């Protein structure tokens, strides 16, 4: 006979700082052993210390938990590459920074595991679209795919 499945009580999506998670209100609301989670999370993310890391926590009725660590959000990576604190207030009219195509490709390669893109070129276009919405230009890259024909 197959083992019984655990009953899920909550699935929480949180953004935590790599290597620096602490027990607090956000974790308390999930209903897990916070000390055990923070120790495990900090050990797993110690190489990404200080970066914002999305995590999906599945809490079970018996107070046990599973979690999945995702890659850092594109907006944080773009701001870090451009060395800015925030994007443009009006990105259609204002460009606050420019990054190189190599920097954008590096971000695309890093994010490819969490994206729906099948190759680096498609991932680069997605990164370019996010950058455009933040008022960040990428040298030699358009946020839009050129139309063939016409």
UniProtKB/Swiss-Prot annotation:
Single GO molecular function: structural constituent of ribosome
Disulfide bonds: none
Keyword Electron transport recorded: no
SUPFAM superfamilies per record: Ribosomal L11/L12e N-terminal domain (SSF54747), Ribosomal protein L11, C-terminal domain (SSF46906)
Keyword set includes RNA-binding: yes
CC terms in the record's Gene Ontology section: cytosolic large ribosomal subunit
CDD domains: Ribosomal_L11
PTM note: One or more lysine residues are methylated.
UniProtKB keywords: Methylation, Ribonucleoprotein, Ribosomal protein, RNA-binding, rRNA-binding
One family name in Pfam for this protein: Ribosomal_L11_N
GO biological process annotation, one example: translation
Subunit description: Part of the ribosomal stalk of the 50S ribosomal subunit. Interacts with L10 and the large rRNA to form the base of the stalk. L10 forms an elongated spine to which L12 dimers bind in a sequential fashion forming a multimeric L10(L12)X complex.
Function, in words: Forms part of the ribosomal stalk which helps the ribosome interact with GTP-bound translation factors.
Family: Belongs to the universal ribosomal protein uL11 family.
HAMAP family registered for this protein in UniProt: Ribosomal_uL11
Name the record gives this protein: Large ribosomal subunit protein uL11
Species this chain originates from: Ureaplasma urealyticum serovar 10 (strain ATCC 33699 / Western)
